């Protein structure tokens, strides 16, 4: 999708986050304190990224997940911006900036914390997976 089409499709915040590597404000975003059962997809492409089963309250101010739905749906890049070194997380299909992954997550779940911007995500409630075209993902919740 071309930049001009994306500017029309996305909110200004979602565009800034996904296309310009922005970061939304902590503790004031849509999914930080949201724990309904369902699927989180890339707001740009609709690619499934995370499930609510892997979401947890990390206290960081952004949605946190222990793992993506499949390692292939995200790619990681070294990020040396803001005078620090981090690992950026991007969606594989649309190359959307999602957030960062850190090694301070729950040890019993692998030790990773995927710290993701709400503005990069669209939530599909479990009871709407079939009607929204994500019926194949119901199996993840059984």
Swiss-Prot record:
Its EC number is 1.8.4.12. One of its GO terms (cellular component) is cytoplasm. GO terms for biological process: protein repair; response to oxidative stress. Residues 3-126 form the MsrB domain. InterPro entries: Met_Sox_Rdtase_MsrB, Met_Sox_Rdtase_MsrB_dom, Mss4-like_sf. It is an enzyme of class 1 (oxidoreductase). It catalyses: L-methionyl-[protein] + [thioredoxin]-disulfide + H2O = L-methionyl-(R)-S-oxide-[protein] + [thioredoxin]-dithiol. Keywords: Oxidoreductase. GO terms for molecular function: peptide-methionine (R)-S-oxide reductase activity. The active site is at 115 (nucleophile). HAMAP family: MsrB. Belongs to the MsrB Met sulfoxide reductase family. PANTHER family: METHIONINE SULFOXIDE REDUCTASE, PEPTIDE METHIONINE SULFOXIDE REDUCTASE MSRA_MSRB. This is Peptide methionine sulfoxide reductase MsrB. The gene is msrB.
């Amino acid at each position: 999708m071309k930049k001009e089409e994306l500017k029309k499709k996305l909110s200004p915040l979602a565009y800034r986050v996904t296309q310009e590597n922005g970061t939304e404000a902590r503790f004031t975003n849509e999914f930080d304190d949201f724990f309904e059962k369902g699927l989180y997809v890339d707001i740009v492409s609709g690619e499934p990224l995370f499930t609510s089963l892997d979401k947890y309250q990390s206290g960081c101010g952004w949605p946190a997940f222990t793992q993506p739905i499949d390692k292939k749906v995200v790619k990681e890049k070294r990020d040396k911006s803001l005078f620090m070194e981090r690992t950026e997380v991007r969606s594989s299909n649309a190359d959307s900036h999602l957030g960062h992954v850190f090694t301070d997550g729950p040890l019993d779940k692998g030790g990773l914390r995927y710290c993701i911007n709400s503005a990069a995500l669209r939530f599909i409630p479990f009871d709407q997976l079939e009607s929204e075209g994500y019926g194949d993902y119901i199996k993840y919740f059984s």
